[in-house]
Amino acid sequence: SICEALGQTNPSLALPFSATLWGWNFGFDYAPDGYRLHASHQQIHQQYALIPATVPAGEPGGGPMRPAFACGDMLQEFVQDYRRHTGKSFFECYAQALAANQRMDGRSDRPADLVVYQDEHVVLFVPKAQTSQWELQLMTRGAVGNILEADTATRDALDRSLHIAMRVLTSLGATLITVIEYSKR
């Protein structure tokens, strides 16, 4: 399997990848010159890519190597800093904060729950501090570092949750939606 090949200790058999890039571009919009799809290549698609640990720093095929970047690297750095400063797991604390959410306006006559959908494998929710309008976050309940590590039940839960997210966002008027994975190394 790919996971076994990625974890191979024999360098001649190991795949040179250490992270994944997984995501969707979904939707279309109307522009004065006609319909446009949500991607530079004008496709509704789902992508899977394996990211190498290093890439050539200069000319292809020669020169020094440098670490490749994946968006999950920033999250990994934050999670490590969080543990170093608090002694706690960020994701465990994040899940606890999500479950114990309270309204910032102090009202008790309105819902305080940020969860859109949840099951035994995942939780889809509105983050307390959104970075963009209508942002939703999807988090696995188990220690799944990337899509390759997800078992069938977790992948099914991810698919179901993403479908729910697309339906919710499009019902609110969203026409162009991007989904990305922040994977571990």
Question: Where do the model's predicted regions map?
Answer:
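HIT superfamily nucleotide-processing domains
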Residues: 1-185
